[in-house]
Amino acid sequence: EEGWVPGPSLISLQMRVTPKLMRLAWDGFPLHYSEKHGWGYLVPGRQDNLPAASAEPEGPVCPHRAIERLYRQHCLQRGQEQPPEEAGVEDELMVLEGSSMWQKVEELSQLELDMERPGRAEQSQMQDEDGLPELVEESSQPSFHHGNGPYNDVNIPGCWFFKLPHKDGNENNVGSPFAKDFLPRMEDGTLRAAVGRTHGTRALEINKMVSFWRNAHKRVSSQVVVWLKKGELPRAVTRHPAYSEEEDYGAILPQVVTAGTITRRAVEPTWLTASNARADRVGSELKAMVQVPPGYSLVGADVDSQELWIAAVLGEAHFAGMHGCTAFGWMTLQGKKSDGTDLHSKTAATVGISREHAKVFNYGRIYGAGQPFAERLLMQFNHRLTQQQAREKAQQMYAVTKGIRRFHLSEEGEWLVKELELAVDKAEDGTVSAQDVQKIQREAMRKSRRKKKWDVVAHRMWAGGTESEMFNKLESIALSASPQTPVLGCHISRALEPAVAKGEFLTSRVNWVVQSSAVDYLHLMLVSMKWLFEEYDINGRFCISIHDEVRYLVQEQDRYRAALALQITNLLTRCMFAYKLGLQDLPQSVAFFSAVDIDRCLRKEVTMNCATPSNPTGMEKKYGIPRGEALDIYQIIEITKGSLEKK
């Protein structure tokens, strides 16, 4: 081309040559692209595909010796600064909340369903074996490295080819090592520019830094904004000492779909999904840019462990009708993060993973995800785990928490046991194990001419786990003729009623019970707050709810009364839940919010300064917004003297 000069030109992260130019390596192994398998990496040491010494090479020779040296160098460096096994996980990865998690849970639970259906286990095992990329001999795979491979149809002399791990499973190809799912691996040093390549490392850092804004800027710039003239502003704003006529005052109208999911949760792509401010993410202070006009405050709170408590109280009402009567409920009520006795800390200790990871597993499990989900997630969080190790950890976790399946025999099953004189081990509650059910089926098929399978099971249940009672209750609601939420009696979509869906979508229906009850919780809170604001003349209005979090725009002089109203609302809402489930009292540990936030901008914690690359001086220096207040019930009572009356 005319005007061409040596050096990089129009190179973007989307180009296949970029990882090579940066000399990107995965655990010390250089990245390589295969048309068939997508991005992977080369592991040196393969002998069976080396050309004979006498043969003339047709094209360029793979420098497998240099790759070996690179890996040795990486091992030496790793020996000096060994990364922790549980790598820090990026916010985006933890967002398995809401719809994205839900899709994943549904897909993975389908796997579990397939495994539970008769005859499917063997079939799926055969399919798995058929679906393997290539059954490789012991000699043609490295002894010092395991991963997703080797794929020996990629014939690189002296090297095995392994695929990069994909978040949706190893059968999927990775299209770009710069995708946001690889940010945690960049942070923990698994994916980095090879030793001594400072430019590559810096490019990765910049990519990580702009990742949030690259994904969010179009949504942010397309927000609907209404600017207000001075005459349209309340007097409380225009008469406030901080009011400036040179400033523009307006409001964003978030385009919320009010019941956008099957569980009636709101859907909105920007504000309901925005992550918290991070020091290494451009634009991540986005939420804090929503600031109140002079003379107003944002009063709000997060409902503590909302869905965990709802699930726990359902199980307790089902088990003994007393708060804290199940292990799961006791941990929810009495567990403390500082003592390591809360649910997430216990799960983390049981399986040997970090608390943050345990949180994702716990919510996934309560949403109805099965063991395949846990296995895949374990391998996603720690790519150095083998399939077998992940399976063992997942089995251990599910046996301790969810328990094991037990079965109540149908009349046909009881008759077969009697007629065939089979010895089955019945528990106190009359249930039998899966092995006994299989034995009855096997003997019945062997001794009868009937080709159709015998229907020996009346219904299934969970037993022996800390959460068994809770899952039994959730499944009993989900499988009832017309599932409805226990508190406000909201019915499930007719498309998911058992008469239509039969045994399908059980995961969705179990999740619906908990998440739709959480929406009942929100609706009760909104109604209670509206009533208290009107009854006690509190000058404020509802601003936004972000799933288990509510925010109210309140005039400054009423902010503490609004905070007390919020605490009373939480008390009334929890009481309503307990009463509807037949419980006549409420533990104090869940009666009130641990803290009500009074602030001048939207942020996760009132103490966060939200310093980011695009807001380096933070909220206080640049915008004059000091730290807010986070008040517990005792502090609020002290300030308001326990009264909502206007003084």
Swiss-Prot record:
Biased composition (Acidic residues): 127-137
Cofactor(s) this protein requires: Mg(2+)
Main location: mitochondrion
Keyword entries, A-Z: DNA replication, DNA-binding, DNA-directed DNA polymerase, Magnesium, Mitochondrion, Mitochondrion nucleoid, Nucleotidyltransferase, Transferase
An annotated Gene Ontology molecular function: DNA-directed DNA polymerase activity
CC terms in the record's Gene Ontology section: gamma DNA polymerase complex; mitochondrial nucleoid; mitochondrion
Function: Involved in the replication of mitochondrial DNA. Associates with mitochondrial DNA.
The protein's name in its UniProt record: DNA polymerase subunit gamma-1
The organism of origin for this protein: Gallus gallus (Chicken)
Taxon lineage: Eukaryota, Metazoa, Chordata, Craniata, Vertebrata
